[in-house]
Amino acid sequence: MNSCENPIVLTDGDVRFRLDTDAVPGWCDGWMTLSAAGTLPVPDTLPGDRLILPVDEGIALPVDTPVEPGEFALDTLTRARNCREKTLNLFLMVRGGKCLAITTDSGLHTGYALRWADGRYHLTLTSDAPVTVRYRIFGTAAAACRAYRAMRPAAVPLRDKIARTPALAQLIGGAIFWVWNDGYDEVMYADRDTDRVPDTGGAMLDVAADLHANGVDRAMFGLFFDGDSRLAQPLAERFGYLATQYDNYNDVLNPALVGVVPTNRVRNCGYTARRMKDYPAGIARSRSGELASAWALKGFDGQFHAQNALCPAVAAQRMREEIPPILAQYPAYRGRFIDVYGTGVGECFDPRHPLTVDDCLTVKRGAFASLRDMGLIVGTEDGFEELLDDLDYAEGLHSPVVFRNRDSGRNHAHVYTDAQEAHIARYMLHPAYRFPMMELAYHDCILAFPYWGDSTEMSPAQIRRKTLFACLYGCPPLYSFTVGNYPRLRGAILDSYRTISAVHRAVGLMEMTDFGVLTPDCTVQRAVFGDEIEVIVNFGDRAYEADGRRLEPLGLHWGAIRK
């Protein structure tokens, strides 16, 4: 039940959410509505509240407990438009066993900020255009997410995406593998030139052969360096594996930096050489005319030097020009992973290729659709809901960016250090800090993989917890490792694949229809898929018993719901 007082206080039983505003409320389909612009009315948090925010698939924050920074600091989080820190236009505040949902009718123009003050986190919502804000109290956060899905435009389900790109079916119960040469980082991130060839070559086929011989029957291998494109065909012919090629239409190396940074990337990363032709004419510009910056490279001086960001409109044109000849040369490719492009939207003020935020979304959707029209499985980094119809999978969506380790983008084939493992255990793998917002809204529409710098096997001591999260959320695994580390990781990779694959084959095409926490400490959680299959996990160190069922520590139960 939702009721409203004057001044505006939304109540449900003893739970109250106060809105300090003079706006006159309306009601529509059970939601209270307000018209607003600029700073939007949001209740202040109270001690004991939890905020559930759309960072990648979703995070849950006890508002009175500060989070130590990892890749980003939460207390300075400000995201104005749809991006990986705002994948859904939905914000949840949990208080007294109830959940207040807040959304607007224009996600593209709604942003939020999180700040730490007076011993707790505070949430601010803003809009750069007039919007209708909707508020409603639900009994559970899961019910709020499901109601949000019901009020959104219909999304393209994975079943329809498989119908148009049949190879995608291989990822239902499958996995993505990024297998790296032991010296790849000397080429990618060193501050000196090297003659080392970064291609993984035949060693990747050896790993693939071992995986296949041990039951990994569904997989897609990511190929990063151009020299490894020749592996796409034997991966398909020998093992039935898919191959996708890494590509980048964002990071542009200023030719003047050749000689300042090592030439390794120019010589070995085909996309780097292809991007340089668009400097400076194709670079996105700010309102003041400055060139947009992008991923930094280490120079001979040991310092990092920023590249520049290609305008999304120019990027879309380059995809249409460059990818077909590559596919003609390597027809065994079945996918394309476009890094960075799916992480957000922006503007460009260069008069040769101007873009508004709305234009940018249209351009990016068209670019991804063009890959689909080439018959490719379409993937990107993170993604957000307005892109979902044109994407098949997203790497990083299952690894909330604010909980990743610092520099995880540069450490995407390393085994965690003790300090990195401790940070991941504290947040990324802590069940109280995660919540499957994206899965409750769109599980049947997108495949959400981990980030390659937070891959399934990266913490051998924690791989069981990674496996439990994947099963609970119905997400497939992603493995990223060097060939030299494969022998020590092999057993854990195979065990996790077998466990996750079995669950994902059963639930991968279903909606997540319910989700709940079964214990006060959040260690035992339950997800329901299609109102048919339940997955229950115990993240705790004590056995859990209920309804005649016993679940051991780090235990997993899944199957048909008991009637």
Spans of features found by a protein language model:
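Active-site-proximal substrate-binding groove within the catalytic cores of carbohydrate-active enzymes
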Residues: 12, 20, 24-30, 35-37, ...
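Short acidic-hydrophobic catalytic motif
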Residues: 166-172, 176, 180, 203, ...
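Substrate-binding/active-site clefts of carbohydrate-active enzymes
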Residues: 242-315
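Segments forming glycine/polar-rich beta-alpha architectures that bind adenosine-containing cofactors
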Residues: 204-223, 539
